[in-house]
Amino acid sequence: MAAGKELHVGLTDEYPPLSYVDANGQRRGFEFDLAADLCRRLGRTCVWTFGTQEKLLRGLRDGSLDLIFAQRLEPKQEGLLYSTPYYHSRAMCIGRPGGRGPDEAGARIGVYRGSVLVQRARGFWPEAIIVTGSVQELIERLKQGGIDVLFINDLAGYAFLLTDAGLEFDRLDIPFDAETRATGSCVAVRAGRHDLLAAVNRELKTLLYSGELHNRSRNYFQYIIY
């Protein structure tokens, strides 16, 4: 794989603390930092694309993107290549204590659009109303009473609960199957780029075993994510 060339990288623009714009208008996030570090290690210049999962997936399909840090495009898409996991997350439900739970008929459950959790929510709670949107949109709906429960991965969930707005909410004690409890998150690489996949896996392994990945994650998380 030639060094010194541009690497077209896609990230979600609406998923704090993984990728988001802070109050000062600066791009931040664990995945953003990791992607920038990966480009540097590969000797490539990052060319960024931020958008919805649907937009990023189209970019991989049409060749305008080389890879995306959007493992929430599950189930895994046929023809794309996937790295080894760079973190593990678990699903959780967030709601108001004493409020309507997800197993109650007519419960409104918010789920990040395009994620594997949409399918699982429909399977777990067939009588519920599933509402999809960005993380920011769903959090606003939860705060305003537009949804009863937020079904989300715990990285984004705990980040919200630690904010002032999250103080009136809590994690709901809901049992899940083993696959939902722990999910490995991967970089998706466009079809045919086995050389790029091998390089990504090599650098992710170095970051993991050297402790650099853990040190970087401490900027956003207070617990081990791998």
Task: For each feature predicted by the language model, list its residue ranges.
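Ligand-binding clefts/hinges and TM-proximal coupling segments of bilobed small-molecule sensing domains
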Residues: 120-137, 169-173, 204-226
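Short glycine-rich His-centered loop
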Residues: 4-29
